[in-house]
Amino acid sequence: IGVRLVGSEMCIRDSYYLCVIGKEQKDEEAVLEHAGKLLEYPDTPYSQEALIARAEILFNRKHFDQALTDYKQLKAKATTTERRQLAATGMLRSAAMMQDDVETIAAATDMLAEAKLTPELRNEALYFRAKAYLNQQADKKAMNDLQALAKDTRTLYGAEAKYLVALQLYKAHEYAAAEKEILNFIEQSTPHAYWLARSFILLSDVYVAMDKKLDARQYLLSLQQNYHADDDIEQMINERLEKLK
């Protein structure tokens, strides 16, 4: 037994060093091979590092279901806050990329329970959870997350959330509240011009619903003159102006 144990220990150590060398040389196949060998012995001192290395490659290769499985294992084994957070983040991103709403909501909720979460990771968790809630028609829960995000329109997630809050109000036929939300966004401003432009277009839709077609047209013309990015905004403006003739 002693000889076998020594043999397996040597095999584990060799696999670990080969995994590290593979990582340094950016040899993904070597990392996958040797991390896989290490993980055949689940309770080695190296299993967390092996899971981190393998999950990262699987995620980058878009094998999100396999990455999610590894990140879940890492979460269960993690011995430090940093590794637990890394696992939770990996779980969230993998689930979100798979568009698995149930897994995304679970991973985000798990992540938001972490004590030392950076504002960036908190925003990411709120954003992905809000989008998953919207997909699941859990509009009230989505609105809570979106409103929390929308407090800071300087971030990309915050800017999109501000627009989505107004969109939810518009869909609920709460036109006065939607108008107020968008005018507040315009006043606050944001470095993320696309979401501000989308909000101008939404405001024109709100005004059409309120039978203020002149105001709707004015906002569209103002946006047409001032927004010149190469995206889908121009088409949205033209479609609406055509209907307002």
Say what each PLM segment does.
Residues 211-231:
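TPR/TPR-like (Sel1-like) alpha-helical repeat modules
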